[in-house]
Amino acid sequence: MAGPDGGLLGVLENVRRGMIPAHIYNDPELFALEKRRLFARAWTFVGHESEIPHDGDYMVRRVLDDSFIITRGSDGRVRALFNMCLHRGMQVCRAELGNASNFRCSYHGWTYRNDGRLTGLPFHREAYGGDDGFVKDQTLLPAPNFAGYNGLLFISLDPAAPPLQDFLGDFRFYLDYYTRQSAGGVELRGPQRWRIRANWKIGAENFAGDMYHTPHTHASIVDIGLFREPKAQKRKDGATYWAHRGGGTTYKLPPGGFEERMRYVGYPDEMIGRIKQVWTPRQQRVVGEDGFMVSAATCFPNLSFVHNWPKVRDGRDDETLPFISIRLWQPISENETEVCSWFAVDSAAPAHYKQDSYKAYLMCFGSTGMFEQDDVENWVSLTTTAGGSMARRLLLNSRMGLYDDGRPVVEALAPSAFHGPGRAQVGYNEHNQRALLAMWADYLQEGDACENR
């Protein structure tokens, strides 16, 4: 675990000043700490309510090593139940998703209702003497904390975790852009799942604020004209923002009002009308007055978003089509990540829009998306190199946007120029990556999460 300055505290101090010990991207000891101190505490995304729309629907999701059944009970309530039988610890549900009124353990036949209640125990009287030996009035272990925001579902393994709303803080302002375009919210398709030989933090950092890589890593996509914003200058003119628990990037849009700018990125008038009903005046001002449109973002620790508007149809140079993607960087080990990628679309959008937007998403992102191939090559290379002995002697410079004395190269935007909460600035910088890793360092410096003994 030791870095150039030695010891965990030295590693974390370097991270906080923007000089990143390269080995943090491939270190088994640090990954063990992440499991005990970060993912045992933070709120982690596990899915969306639209994935289980009907009573009895369920999906099985993980928070690292812990498997949970996310189920909509017969009472319509959504619950998160630890996927482990109370008897001998077998996983109660072994399918990824489905619809069921009961879950039966295949080991000894113990049966649970979809609300977690134990309802069937073979030979209860003969084997246990009835309730005198084992009280049947028990349930599968619920997640210590389970809550939602705009249909997004989160679990925290920490019984003392702050409420989800407090954890998200001002970043909720930006979450609404991705998850609320009408009163009914968004619906999800997916997830696609695939594994990459890369550390989970790299993707989270990239989506949080790396506008600098776009004209270089994705040069071939720029060259074929997929971007409506083809010049590197357009990325530099956009703003990055950081608000409490997350941050992201934006594009600077051409002059115009709110409706005109929404049309520019491809939204039809009927959707714009619904968006105006649910986005606050302040949220609309970021687009209509400030001229910024959200693009990629990350919510700490490992949930990211993409909003883009590629040119996907031949014959019309000005026609673009927006899409939204939600993704989870699920850690498998210090050098492997399971990427879970969902397509998200307004539930009230026209059917033809949903289908076309989905095609745009598949072209750009997902396991075979053009952007995906470019990014993963970089991330795998970084992770592989970070696992060697020389990487423990190297500090990666993540101080873009700062002078040596810590002053910003470009001052933060005034509230009158950027109406969103948090800190925003234009120009290439790594403020968001530093903020994300500083939060990571804070969690790792705390003691291990408490557990029952």
Annotate each PLM feature.
Residues 47-54, 134-136, 367, 381-384:
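Short linear motifs in intrinsically disordered
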